Amino acid sequence: MAKITKVEVQKNNKQKVNIYLDGEYKARMYLDTCVKYGLHAGVEIEEDRLNELVLESEKVMALNLAVKYVSTALKTKKQIVDYLKKKEFQPEIIDYVVDKMLEYRYIDDMEYIRAYFNTYSNKFGISRLQYNLRSKGVSQKLIDEYMDSLEEEMDTLSTCIALLKKKAKNMDLSDIKNRQKLSRFLASRGFEFDDINHAMMEVTKER
């Protein structure tokens, strides 16, 4: 059994304290956990028990940070993992937080896909939408499941035409360089060649 000889609030982080056992620095802990378990100078504690409390403290803080992180916008599972890694939490802490976030549905990659398509399907083609989702850590398998669940195919041609009209508003479409520039723009947005070609013909015909 060791004795806590000092509990010191960290200078650079008032939410954390340094714990000293028998005159030597032993661990850091979040202040809330320290107060919760009545840890102060003079208290005797087993080192194993102290380590358990440190782990609990890390879990609570990591979970609180993750919940705050998702409060502003939907996040993917991978975004949560990457965020906590940047905060230098250990893998076991991150796994714990991710499990809790999934359990309480703070994160749901399928819901993220649905929301992403609803928000950006009028700006990008399918291939670009899928690429963007994969870059955020969403699996292609889950994306495919979402695509298969749609009752109707996405009207990518109408979206392509709308974007082309906006982009080409003050451009001469009889100029081959302008047409090439516009085609590259639409391709970069993830539209297929057939949609781009049909959109170009439709917009040109309307003028």
Q: Would you name each region that the model predicts?
A:
Residues M1-R207:
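An alpha-helical, amphipathic repeat domain used for nucleic-acid recognition
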